[in-house]
Amino acid sequence: MCDDEVAALVVDNGSGMCKAGFAGDDAPRAVFPSIVGRPRHQGVMVGMGQKDSYVGDEAQSKRGILTLKYPIEHGIITNWDDMEKIWHHTFYNELRVAPEEHPVLLTEAPLNPKANREKMTQIMFETFNSPAMYVAIQAVLSLYASGRTTGIVLDSGDGVSHTVPIYEGYALPHAILRLDLAGRDLTDYLMKILTERGYSFTTTAEREIVRDIKEKLCYVALDFEQEMATAAASTSLEKSYELPDGQVITIGNERFRCPESLFQPSFLGMESSGIHETVYNSIMKCDVDIRKDLYANIVMSGGTTMYPGIADRMQKEITALAPSTIKIKIIAPPERKYSVWIGGSILASLSTFQQMWISKEEYDESGPGIVHRKCF
C-alpha cells in the first residue's frame, strides 16, 4: 500500500460544497455543491434519458424542475443513500478514478457523533472497496494549511462553525467549541429579511439564488449601529442584483444585517454566543500559559469567513474581550475557502503520515470501530 506512485484522494465533504482532488495538489480539482436533486414532475418525453436523481452542478443547473436536498446538515450526514450518490459522483464523474485503487482522506467536523464516522468508514471499505482511508478533523487541516502548529482555528462553513485550539500540533479537545450557526442559517435569514422588502423566495431552488446574492453582496460592518444609520440616511450602500428571469432587485442594509448574525445570533432567535465570544471562550478554556500564543494566531477558515470586513471586525471584538496588553492577530488567508482541503492534501502527502492510514485488512479484522483508535 505504501507505493508512492498511487496518489491519495482528498475529499472534504462540507455541508454546502464538496471539495475533492489529489494529495500533493495545491487546490481541489473538483468543487461542487453537496446537493442531490430529484424531479418534481413526471417525465413525458421518451428517450430523453431522464435520471431519477442529479448530483452537484447538474442538479444546480436543473434546479428549476428539481427538489434539492442537502444530505449533510450541520456537518453531520443525515441521508446516507444520498451521501453515497455524492461520493460515487466524486470518484467516477468528477475525479474519474477507481476508488479501489486509491487511499482516501475524508474530513469531519469536531464533536460529531461517533456513529457518523463509523458509517463513513464502513461505506468507504464496503461500498467503494478503498484500499485505505483516514478521517481528519477539519480545523486541524486548516492549521496545517496555514503552516502553523499552534493557533486557534475558527472554521465556519455552510453547516457548522467551530473553534479548535491547537498547541504544538496537539488539539485541546476540552476547549473545542461548536456552534451550529453557519452559512446556511445566514442564507435562510437573508431569505427572511428579503421577504420584508417584498421579494419572496421560498423554494429550494430559490434558496440557491439567495445564497448567490449573499456570496456576492454581503459584508460585515465594523460598527453595526453606525452602518445602520448610514444605510437609513442615504442610498450609498444599496446594490442591485439581477435574478435569473431578468428582474432586478435592490438590497441595502440587508447586505450587512445578514452576516451580523454571526456576531449577534439573537438575530436568528438563537440563544448562543457570537463567533467572537466563542473564540474567546475557547481560548479561556485553555491553560493560562498558552493563551498568549493562541491570541496571536487566530486562523479563519471556511466559506462563511469570506465576507469582506470580517477579519477587522473580529480583531475589534476580540480586542474588546481580551486583556489590554495582549497581542491579537487574525490570520485570514485568501484561499481560506479551501484551506481544509489544502491541509488534507498536505497531510496525505507527508511521508510520516503513510503509517497512519487504516488499511482494508485492519478494517476487516476490527470493524468500523477502528476509526476511533486510529484517527484523532
UniProtKB/Swiss-Prot annotation:
The modification N-acetylaspartate is found at D3. Its main location: cytoplasm. It comes from the Eukaryota. InterPro entries: Actin, Actin/actin-like_CS, Actin_CS, ATPase_NBD. It is an enzyme of class 3 (hydrolase). Oxidation of Met-45 to form methionine sulfoxide promotes actin filament depolymerization. Methionine sulfoxide is produced stereospecifically, but it is not known whether the (S)-S-oxide or the (R)-S-oxide is produced. The keyword Translocase does not apply. It is found in: Cytoplasm, Cytoskeleton. Actins are highly conserved proteins that are involved in various types of cell motility and are ubiquitously expressed in all eukaryotic cells. This is Actin-2, muscle-specific. It comes from Bactrocera dorsalis (Oriental fruit fly).
